[in-house]
Amino acid sequence: IAGGSNNEFMAKAQFWLGNELVDRGSAIAVPISADGSRFSAAGDSRIEQIIGQLHASHTLHDSKPLLVGMSSGGSEAMAIAALNPHAYRGVVATPGRIKTDTALQELNKLPFYIRVGEKDDFKWDRILESMTQRLRLAGAEVNSAIVQDARHVFQIDWESLENWLGKLK
């Protein structure tokens, strides 16, 4: 999921992660908001519509979708999942953050895989522990870690991620 203004630049920034996921057998969509509005706005059904279109046009597993994003895309994936935790299989945010003013409902053991660079340009490493605690208090199952020596954008530890993905229901 591309976050921020959801423009073409953000979609391209998500592309390498998406390519890796496709190479590993996933179907992906990188949505772009034409008007720059966030997909996590209350009442916004565009993500559900995109997922429906993917199922209508491709042969996919019937399992719930996994929301994945990096940077503001990771933050947006987390915010979307927090609005409707029953609709998703989990969230991968590498990195991502949930804003402190975001209301969290019961997350019903929704799995989150969150990684933030030790030298994050936006200092998200400083909030990872409190964010993890907040998500857990809301009922999420959180696998979070600081990536040593990494900045805001970093290489994914695919062995760790695939191990986590293998445990999803």
Language model regions located:
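C-terminal catalytic histidine-bearing segment of alpha/beta-hydrolase fold enzymes
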Residues: Y113-R115, D121-K169
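Short substrate-entry loop that stabilizes the transition state in hydrolases
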Residues: I1-F39, F122
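Short, solvent-exposed loop/turn and secondary-structure capping segments
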Residues: E8-A13, S40-A42, A79-I80, A103-L104, ...
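Gly/Ser-rich "nucleophile elbow"/oxyanion-hole loop immediately N-terminal to the catalytic nucleophile
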Residues: F39-S71
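Primarily recognizes the serine-hydrolase "nucleophile elbow" in alpha/beta-hydrolase
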Residues: S57, S63-K109
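Alpha-helical scaffolding within the catalytic cores
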Residues: M10-N19, S45, Q49-I50, P95-Q105, ...
